[in-house]
Amino acid sequence: MSSVEQVRSADEATTIRMERTYAASAEEVFDAWTSPEVLRRWWFVEPSQRTAVADVDLRVGGSYRLTMEDADSGARHTVVGEYEEILRPELLVYSWRWELDKGGTGHQSRVSVRFISDGEHTTVVLTHSGLEDAASAERHSVGWSACLEHLASSAL
């Protein structure tokens, strides 16, 4: 397995792109992104967090809802969106909006996950585009890096 590689060009300050290779089939890795049971094992940033909610309606136009909860503070962070493209086990594209504490949702961005198989290994190419600004891109970069590491250590 390789470490997370991140690529960002200066003209794409609101887009992050990461790659990570896993010792698993494309089907296994794709399923880890779409199975509520498996998502609960890896979709969080900090060790003190857990995935309290993982709801998935895996169909084009279907929705998802993922909630990270901090064990110490009880703070909850929920992201919601809709699936735009599903091509198992090669591609997953979905919208991304954080729920706001005051109600409603924030800025919408887009996540594209490609699963590239070479037989025994699968490379995940994650592109998160349309983020609100460079600061948001940096925060999401930190979060996705942690999640991709947890995917390797806790789910595959």
Model-flagged regions — what are they?
Residues 40-41, 45-48, 54-60, 65-118, ...:
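Hydrophobic-ligand binding "helix-grip"
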Residues 120-132:
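Short helix/strand-capping connector loops at secondary-structure junctions
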Residues 129-156:
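A conserved amphipathic terminal alpha-helix motif
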Residues 29-30, 39, 64, 83, ...:
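Hydrophobic pocket/interface hotspot
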Residues 34-35, 44, 88, 153-156:
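Residues at helix-coil transition
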Residues 1-49:
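Hydrophobic ligand-binding cavity/cleft-lining segments
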